[in-house]
Amino acid sequence: MIRVLQDGILEPVPFFLLHHQHSALECDAAFAAWQGFASPLRRQPAVSSCLAGGHAVWWRVETPDRGAALALLPPYVAHRTDAIPVRDVEIP
């Protein structure tokens, strides 16, 4: 997605990799936190290592900034999540 800045310059909207981690004991709470929370990420597939014993979840989101990226998550999940700016690259 491209956004237009005030001076008319085109700029790509940043992508963030949301990397959430929780302990095995927090797994149920991390998933329950989504109940009643409105987000476009709900009911969508996410990459997770929970069923493999790693207890991490990753989302790739397109938002203007880190705060907007973390706002897509329920507070319980957001407090345990890093929002990492990422860009696509071609691998030679």
For the regions a protein language model found, what residue spans apply to each?
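Conserved, structured core segments of small domains
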Residues: 2-92
